[in-house]
Amino acid sequence: MKRIFLLIATNLAVLLVASIVMSILGVNTSTMGGLLVFAAIFGFGGAFISLAISKWMAKKAMGCEVITMPRDGTERWLVETVARQAQQAGIKMPEVAIYQSPEMNAFATGPSKDNSLVAVSTGLLYGMSQDEVEAVLAHEVSHVANGDMVTLTLIQGVVNTFVIFAARVVAGIINNVVSSNDEEGEGLGMFAYMAVVFVLDMLFGILASIIVAYFSRIREYRADEGAARLAGKHKMIAALERLRQGPESTAMPAQMSAFGINGKRSMAEMMMSHPPLEKRIAALQAR
């Protein structure tokens, strides 16, 4: 109940702030043009703010310990491997971090190719062979080299804009229909209108999530291909086979999970940010 209340309160707060900002800027959201400007500012604004603070958020959320000075041979090998792969991929050396988690996972994040972070869990670092870890690192470096963080941020901005715009257009149509059938012509009223917008935001948000997940799966196949080039196809297949034998990934927040090696499994593949491991293995074997 508290989670639902916070979700509703957050949504209403965003709408309130958005309305105030649009008023200050003199944008009339009652027109299609004004509404589109409103939707684009908040759709892309939120996505790019998340991208800008992605490294900071990842470090805080996952408790990442950035390796500034390797303490042992394992950490030294980890840093040297990422450095070599980054040079091969033509990108600036990412920060390398370890986070405490028994599950085998890793992720890459950061606002650009030259300002990124590659992090691995202790479960992966000490639960996989060195060849398998090397392949996972190559997968994450490939995400950075392919510019996946920026690409998915742009896609997220587009779908956010669609959700905000479409929800308010449909709510306006509903309000006009109610108003035309109302003798007093008052329409839905402010609170009913906001409730309709909230529900439509949720419904269109589900559709948007499906679109983003589709593009995320495509980027995963590309990162697997990049890893095969950097570390070797057989090493990447071995790493995916090891992940397939392990439990489902559960501990990573959604923002980091999108660029992790091991995604959450779902009955509905279209909602998954990662393709099933079986399909990823088959795609590599077919290369």
UniProtKB/Swiss-Prot annotation:
Keyword Ligase: no
GO cellular component: plasma membrane
Binding site for Zn(2+): 139, 143, 220
Signal peptide: none
UniProt membrane topology term: Multi-pass membrane protein
Pfam families, per database record: Peptidase_M48 (PF01435)
Compartments where located: Cell inner membrane
Cofactor note text: Binds 1 zinc ion per subunit.
Cofactor or coenzyme needed: Zn(2+)
GO MF terms held by the record: metalloendopeptidase activity; zinc ion binding
Keywords: Cell inner membrane, Cell membrane, Hydrolase, Membrane, Metal-binding, Metalloprotease, Protease, Transmembrane, Transmembrane helix, Zinc
Family according to the record: Belongs to the peptidase M48B family.
Entry protein name: Protease HtpX
